A protein has these predicted regions:
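Gly/Ser/Thr-rich phosphate-binding loop
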Residues: 252-256, 266-347, 360, 444
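Conserved ATP-binding/catalytic segment of the ANL
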Residues: 355-422, 427, 439
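Conserved pre-ATP/AMP-binding loop-to-beta segment of ANL
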Residues: 17-20, 131, 151-170, 177, ...
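Conserved AMP-binding/adenylation subdomain of ANL enzymes
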Residues: 189-209, 213-292, 298-301
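ANL superfamily adenylate-forming
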Residues: 114-162, 268-296
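Structural core segment of the AMP-binding/adenylate-forming
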Residues: 10, 52, 79-146, 444
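Conserved AMP-binding A3 loop
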Residues: 32-36, 166-192
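Conserved AMP-binding/adenylate-forming core of the ANL superfamily
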Residues: 21-75, 92-97, 143-146, 185-186
Length: 448
């Protein structure tokens, strides 16, 4: 039975050594990494970790845009028994300062990142900087190539276990200081197995990596799913090349928050000249126009398109339906990924769907969604009080208010802490009101 990331990496290296796992693009050129090449790089860096640190459990930071060496750095630290702390390339200096200090970070992998000028000013004393290939740092640092070269062909001695702590994913949620959500091999792989079953992912499926890997959704749904399903990941060069890179991948699965789907919508409308022109084209040849748009976007091979992380305006979903592009809604959070998703065979627009297999769901007297399932986080790093508030008797208190319709479909109605009382003493949920305004394409953000 495969219970760790390294189990999957070893399996695909053994069965499909020459199959491409990762594809990077730079302009008109591409760089491919097969399973055997990735396996060699990951294990070489894991061996360097073992040569450098006498004990496991060191905090290892990762600050870079999405690229193959993000995966290599991540999995090498896990393979050596250390704890990866991914950080956003847009995070302000004070946030990265807090995360590095709070976790007692010993190593920081540095790739291309737009916030380096801020981060370098708050680096902890004695931290080891490792520059990923192609990155030059003015500060004293080590180079990836120099570290792995002596160990290529070697294997680390450490044997990963399913309950090993492999990552701290920091999230501030809606209030308070950032909390480090603890993730183990199991708390990553069990939800990924649910995704794979629910989305009917096939072995060798293609994935498109463009959202920040510091976010749990990108890390599990793309990196993790590709590892579990022997998939092929295409990295987006940058957001300005999204419409070029996506058709070159033609993914089987894609995840995006509503804002991404809105931006793609605006791009389509701009190509036609106006929404009226879109309507006229669809009226004249709905099937032909739909096929053309699916192919142009690179979504013609997509088996499952997920929109989540924020409320999706129903009008946006209906708009995509006209092109034969079916957006599915779902719910998850860093503490418990993917417990509720929509399914193609039964979709209700506006609903996040129904609980996935082996997931228990309960609604509290305050209408808060509670989730119990294998694969949830064990809690918050070094925050026992916050852990006790959220994880109670095996139930994760999500902080989201829900309602359930007569057919068992779940709907998010707002956050527990967002409700406020008017001067007349009436409780008001701002989210449904805000959602009405966000259906207007000229509205980007709104707050009541």
């Amino acid at each position: 039975m495969l219970t760790t990331y390294t189990d999957y990496l070893n399996q695909w290296n053994s069965q499909y050594p020459d199959q491409v796992w990762l594809r990077e693009r730079s302009g008109d050129s591409t760089t491919d990494w097969t399973w055997s090449q990735a396996h060699r790089e990951i294990n070489a860096m894991a061996c360097w970790f073992e040569s450098r640190f006498a004990t496991t459990g060191q905090s290892v930071g990762l600050l870079s845009r999405n690229r193959a060496h993000w995966y290599f750095a991540d999995l090498s630290a896990c393979a050596a028994g250390h704890v990866v702390v991914p950080m956003f390339t847009t995070a302000p200096g004070e946030t990265t300062d807090y995360v590095m200090s709070f976790t007692d970070m010993k190593v920081l992998f540095v790739g291309e990142t737009e916030n380096w000028d801020q981060v370098r000013q708050v680096l902890p004393e004695g931290i080891l900087l490792i520059a990923l290939p192609g990155v030059d740092l003015a500060q004293e640092h080590l180079r990836w190539e120099d570290l792995v070269a002596p160990f290529r062909g070697s294997m680390p001695a450490y044997q990963c276990q399913a309950d090993d702590l492999v990552s701290l994913v920091f999230t501030s949620g809606t209030t308070g200081v950032p909390k480090g959500v603890m993730q183990t091999h199991s708390s990553n792989l069990i939800p990924i197995a649910r995704f794979s079953s629910t989305f009917s992912m096939a072995v060798g499926a293609k994935f498109f990596s463009y959202l920040p890997l510091a976010h749990i959704a990108e890390r599990q749904l793309i990196e993790g799913s590709s590892l579990v399903n022997c998939g092929e990941v295409h990295f987006n060069e940058n957001l300005t090349t999204l419409l070029r890179d996506l058709p070159l991948c033609r993914p089987a699965f894609m995840f995006g928050p509503p804002r991404v789907w809105e931006q793609l919508q605006q791009g389509i409308i701009a190509q036609f000249g106006s929404q009226d022109a879109v309507d006229a084209a669809l009226e004249a040849d709905a099937e032909g126009v739909g096929k053309m748009i699916r192919e142009k976007l690179g979504l013609d091979q997509a088996q499952y398109l997920l929109t989540a992380a924020a409320p999706t305006p129903p009008a946006l979903i209906h708009w995509y339906d006209r092109f034969g592009i079916c957006l599915m809604e779902g719910f998850g959070q860093t503490e418990c990924m993917g417990p509720i998703v929509s399914r193609k065979e039964e979709r209700r627009i506006g609903s996040i769907g129904k609980p996935t297999e082996d997931v228990e769901v309960r609604v509290s007297d305050e209408d808060e969604l509670l989730v119990k399932a294998a694969g949830c986080s064990p809690g918050y790093y070094n925050m026992p009080e916050k852990t006790a508030e959220t994880f109670i008797d095996g139930w994760v208190h999500t902080g989201d208010k829900v309602r359930i319709d007569e057919d068992g479909f779940y709907y998010i109605t707002g956050r527990v802490k967002d409700y406020f009382k008017t001067i007349q003493g009436k409780f008001v949920a701002p989210t449904p009101i805000e959602n009405i305004f966000t259906e207007n394409p000229y509205t980007e953000q709104i707050c009541l």
